[in-house]
UniProtKB/Swiss-Prot annotation:
UniProt organism field: Rhodopirellula baltica (strain DSM 10527 / NCIMB 13988 / SH1)
UniProt remark on domains: 2 residues (Tyr-52 and Arg-55) present in a large hydrophobic pocket are probably involved in substrate specificity. They are important for desuccinylation activity, but dispensable for deacetylation activity.
Record's protein name: NAD-dependent protein deacylase
Subcellular location: Cytoplasm
Keyword Transferase part of the UniProt annotation: yes
Residues where NAD(+) binds: 8-27, 93-96, 182-184, 207-209, 225
Function: NAD-dependent lysine deacetylase and desuccinylase that specifically removes acetyl and succinyl groups on target proteins. Modulates the activities of several proteins which are inactive in their acylated form.
An example Gene Ontology molecular-function term: NAD+ binding
Primary location group: cytoplasm
């Protein structure tokens, strides 16, 4: 049984990570165009850096920990692969590292990772836990003033290509089980993954509420991921 999992903001919200986008579509009072686009970064890098600095600090708060859903997914993956039951890929839209901290191995972070930065010139990626600013030196050339400010958050902004689309499509087309957890069903291309799964694939959506994509699933489970995912995965482990 080849398994494909897709997770969104809903699974991390239960760990205390806010979704940031409010009912008016604003991110902490800012329009998306200001803090989550290449154009916004070019116009006001200080604002964008501070926005992500705040998010990075919040993620590093010791109170932010993987919840029962993250742990259940990691345990299921380990058992699934150890017993040779098929392929497993966890695709997340989240930029936190809670899946990895829970022990998940085959994680594809399609929107990047908050605890990484990328050089705008070389595309090199570096692990990063501190703040960023327009004066931050390059980690490999700290004395080169021409390289100051060349780092940006390694996250996918609106208008940029998500990571790993070919790998995701390949996993979707051969999936026997597809579970979407805590996703809005409106952000593409993630929202279109369910349509790439084959006819025999069992498609399950786990969310607090209905989404625009709910009708594409064979089953919908309404409830908190930390409650529903352990129960659901226990069912498949026992099969």
């Amino acid at each position: 049984m080849n398994v494909l999992i897709l997770t969104g903001a809903g699974i991390s919200a239960e760990s205390g990570i806010p979704t940031f986008r409010d009912a008016n579509g604003l991110w902490e009072g800012h329009a998306v165009e200001e803090v989550a686009t290449p154009q916004g970064f070019a116009r006001n890098p200080n604002l964008v850096h501070e926005f992500y600095n705040q998010r990075r600090r919040a993620l590093l708060n010791p109170e932010i920990q993987p919840n029962a859903a993250h742990v259940a997914l990691a345990d299921f993956e380990r058992e699934h692969l150890e017993n040779g039951r098929g392929d497993f890929l966890l695709v997340t839209q989240n930029i936190d590292n809670l899946h990895q901290r829970a022990g998940s191995q085959n994680v594809l972070a399609m929107h990047g990772q908050l605890l990484q930065v990328r050089c705008v010139y070389s595309e090199e990626i570096f692990d990063w836990t501190g703040d960023l600013s327009v004066d931050t030196p390059h980690p490999e050339a700290p004395d080169d003033d021409s390289m100051r400010g060349c780092l940006r958050p390694n996250v996918v902004w609106f208008g940029e290509m998500p990571i790993g689309l070919t790998q995701i499509e390949k996993a979707a087309t051969k999936a026997d089980l597809f579970i979407a957890i805590g996703t809005s069903g409106v952000v593409y291309p993630a929202a279109g993954i369910v349509a790439q799964t084959p006819p025999h694939c069992r498609r399950i959506e786990v969310n607090l509420d209905d989404t625009p994509a709910s009708s594409a699933f064979d089953e919908t489970i309404r409830g908190a991921a930390s409650v529903e995912i352990p129960k659901l995965l226990n069912h498949f482990s026992a099969m």
